[in-house]
Amino acid sequence: MAKGKRTFQPNNRRRAKVHGFRLRMRTRAGRAIVTARRAKGRRSLTA
C-alpha cells in the first residue's frame, strides 16, 4: 500500500508568515494570544 508524501515540509519563512509575531499583532485576537502567553510565562511567544 503506497503512502502519500510527508505532510510537514519545514520552511522558516512560511512559519513566520503564518504564525509569526507581526501577524499576531495585526488582529485583536492575535494580540490576546500573545498577552495570554506572556501572562502564562511562556518562553516562546510566537513562531
Curated annotation (Swiss-Prot):
One of its GO terms (molecular function) is structural constituent of ribosome. Gene3D superfamilies: 1.10.287.3980. This is Large ribosomal subunit protein bL34. Belongs to the bacterial ribosomal protein bL34 family. Transmembrane segments: none annotated. The keyword Ribonucleoprotein applies. GO terms for biological process: translation. The lineage of its organism: Bacteria, Bacillati, Actinomycetota, Actinomycetes, Mycobacteriales. Keywords: Ribonucleoprotein, Ribosomal protein. It comes from the Bacteria. Pfam families: Ribosomal_L34. One of its GO terms (cellular component) is ribonucleoprotein complex.
